[in-house]
Regions:
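Serine-esterase "nucleophile elbow" of acetyl-processing enzymes
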Residues: 1-25, 41-49
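Short glycine-rich, polar/acidic loop-and-turn segments at beta strand-coil junctions
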Residues: 25-28, 59
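Short, structural beta-strand-to-alpha-helix junction motif
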Residues: 29-30, 177
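Structural motif
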Residues: 30-38
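Alpha-helical cap/lid subdomain in secreted, periplasmic
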Residues: 38-179
Length: 181
């Protein structure tokens, strides 16, 4: 009972109960903090041959600055670790580009706020010969089709006191609500 939701939480609604989905995502993590926090290790203990591993990073990775950082440097290296580990388990890695933030230009077009990260993900998918789900482009089309005002219904935009303990208005243009997720 909270305003935030992710596609990893909602994806279960699109499968029968014969499919088991384990969502290891945690808000605020980057590819390297996911690995550094041993979440990949934990995930791998549950992974079986024939499983699918959907890998989406980029939102928080782009905040990392400094030597060796960037979409085509450390980020690509960490994403490749996910791919390699999944393959060692006999699983199928699938890359997912990050969803768009709700930031429009003056012409009502969604801005690109993820720098080179979506392109790096697409390039890795080609190089590794694995599928990519392009949520970057899908959410761009969705938000531009809905428009500036209507797209607020996808994100965490709520007046104060909509949720228990929420005393201030929420205007989050990065994170989805259950409808948007």
């Amino acid at each position: 009972n909270e305003p935030w939701a992710s596609w990893g939480q909602m994806i279960t609604r699109f499968f029968t109960d014969k499919v088991c989905i384990a969502n290891y995502a945690e808000s605020g993590l980057s590819a390297n903090t996911f690995i550094g926090g041993k979440r990949l290790d934990k995930l791998l203990t549950q992974m079986k041959k024939g499983d699918y591993l959907l890998i989406e990073f980029g939102h928080n990775d782009q905040k990392q600055k400094g030597p060796g950082k960037g979409a085509y440097y450390s980020f690509s290296y960490y994403i490749k670790q996910f791919i390699d580990e999944a393959r060692l388990k006999g699983a199928y890695p699938v890359l997912v580009t990050p969803t768009r933030r709700r930031q429009y230009d003056k012409n009502g077009k969604i801005k690109d706020t993820h720098a080179d990260y979506p392109a790096a993900i697409r390039d890795i998918a080609v190089r590794e010969n694995i599928p990519v789900i392009d949520l970057q482009d899908m959410t761009k089309v969705l938000c531009e089709t809905m428009g500036v005002e209507e797209s607020k219904h996808l994100y965490v935009h709520y007046p104060a006191n909509t949720y228990p303990g929420q005393t201030q208005e929420l205007k989050d243009n990065t994170h989805f609500n259950t409808f948007g997720a």
